[in-house]
């Protein structure tokens, strides 16, 4: 099991959103194993359990945000096996640097309107469409679990419902809330964590070697 601690940084008017995802293996049914023996025999698919959602109060300064995150990451489970993903777009870069100075190891995600993922210092440039696509994939393949008692669950689902795809003048899909008054901070926080987990860990675990990766496979099972 591994945790993905993801932070979508806000502004004076927008919340900073924190999400914690736990990646756990779920056994795959025999009829969903690959036919190609060269791929091995993946027996488990990755499922993401949303363990925590939080919005920080508006107006917090950067040092306070960094201390808050550092304190949360000192939790026993998170300290041992977590990845810290942070929105490094715009004003996010100074916070990323402050986290590094505080002894943390953040992975920066600079959200762009482009069409390709590219590497950058301490992270990636990632099109917003890529983030939303990764989130859509785990929902469509039923590989995400939202506990009934999860704090801010209703707000997250409201954001998700009102997120829409629009087409700009250059023909590139963009993703934004369909209602101007509805934030997208929770959705983007979760999407960044999912995207990074899927990129670095893959979709499936192999029997005997759970760190191995395999081709993308849909999982028709119901939510846990």
Residues of each region from the PLM?
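Mobile, glycine-rich extracellular loop/lid and propeptide segments
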Residues: 135
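Carbohydrate-associated surface elements
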Residues: 138
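Glycine-rich, anion-gripping cofactor-binding loops and their flanking helix/strand elements
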Residues: 132
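RNase H-like, metal-dependent nuclease domains and their acidic two-metal-ion catalytic environment used
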Residues: 1-110, 117-119, 129, 141-224
């Amino acid at each position: 099991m591994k945790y993905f601690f993801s932070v979508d940084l806000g502004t004076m008017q927008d919340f900073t959103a924190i999400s914690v995802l736990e990646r756990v293996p779920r056994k795959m049914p025999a009829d969903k194993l690959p036919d190609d023996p060269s791929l091995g025999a993946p027996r488990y698919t990755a499922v993401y359990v949303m363990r925590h959602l939080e919005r920080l109060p508006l107006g917090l300064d950067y040092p306070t945000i960094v201390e808050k995150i550092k304190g949360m990451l000192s939790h026993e489970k998170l300290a041992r096996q977590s990845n810290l993903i942070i929105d490094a777009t715009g004003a996010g870069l100074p916070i990323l640097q402050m986290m590094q100075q505080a002894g943390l190891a953040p992975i920066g995600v600079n959200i762009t309107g482009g069409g390709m993922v590219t590497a950058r210092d301490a992270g990636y440039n990632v099109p917003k469409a890529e983030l939303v696509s990764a989130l859509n994939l785990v929902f469509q393949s039923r590989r995400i679990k939202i506990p009934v008692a999860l704090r801010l669950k209703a707000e997250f689902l409201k954001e998700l419902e009102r997120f829409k795809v629009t087409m700009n003048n250059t023909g590139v899909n963009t993703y934004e809330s369909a209602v101007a008054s509805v934030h997208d901070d929770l959705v983007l926080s979760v999407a960044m964590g999912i995207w990074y987990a899927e990129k670095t860990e893959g979709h499936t675990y192999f029997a005997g070697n759970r760190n191995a990766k395999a081709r993308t496979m849909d999982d028709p099972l119901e939510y846990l």
